[in-house]
From Swiss-Prot:
This is Large ribosomal subunit protein uL10. The keyword 4Fe-4S does not apply. GO terms for biological process: translation. The keyword Repeat does not apply. PROSITE patterns: RIBOSOMAL_L10 (PS01109). One of its GO terms (cellular component) is large ribosomal subunit. InterPro entries: Ribosomal_uL10 (IPR001790), Ribosomal_uL10-like_sf (IPR043141), Ribosomal_uL10_bac (IPR022973), Ribosomal_uL10_bac_type (IPR047865), Ribosomal_uL10_CS_bac (IPR002363). NCBIfam families: PRK00099.1-1. Coiled coil: none annotated. HAMAP family: Ribosomal_uL10. One of its GO terms (molecular function) is large ribosomal subunit rRNA binding.
């Protein structure tokens, strides 16, 4: 069914709005998936705060034109689903979602991802998928900051014990 020009403009505006506030975008080939599998993917995406959209490639190119994700234009070929990480707390959510989905659905193929103006293609998408969410990042930072303090504490305890043993 052909889309009316008004419908096309609305789709471009919607995708462009999502892209303008997103932190990362991922493009994948969904050819061969069943409706149930795509529905499962979309449900999981909503749970994670990831915006997914199946759009005609020409409309997607127009929507991404003035965004940092325009670098994905060359990968907008064939059946394409877009995912945008819109949460500041978890910028790698879209890539992580698609990567996990691809593990269980072999026909689902990751094409590319864009993050902070850089293009990641194929297997390199895992770089974004492995980004920690905000909670994990803060935990990692706390453990890094805690390590020198605990070493200092052990050193002071060892010196104290050494001085006590020498005094006795």
């Amino acid at each position: 069914m052909a889309l009316l020009i008004e419908d096309k403009k609305q789709i471009v505006a919607e995708v462009s709005e999502i892209a303008s506030t997103a932190f990362a975008a991922v493009v994948a080939d969904y050819q061969g998936l069943t409706v149930e599998q795509l529905t499962t993917l979309r449900v999981e995406a909503r749970k994670l705060g990831v915006a997914t959209r199946v759009v005609r490639n020409t409309l997607a190119k127009r929507a991404l034109q003035d965004t940092p994700f325009s670098i994905l234009n060359d990968d907008l070929v064939g059946p394409t689903i877009l995912a945008f990480s819109t949460s500041e707390d978890d910028m790698g959510a879209a890539a992580r979602l698609f990567e996990e989905f691809a593990k269980t659905n072999k026909v689902f193929e990751l094409k590319a991802a864009a993050f902070e103006g850089k293009l990641y293609q194929g297997a390199d998408v895992s770089v974004i998928a492995n980004l920690p969410n905000q909670e994990k990042a803060l935990t990692m930072l706390a453990s890094v900051l805690q390590a020198p303090v605990s070493k200092l504490g052990r050193l002071i305890t060892a010196l104290k014990e050494k001085n006590e043993s020498e005094a006795a």
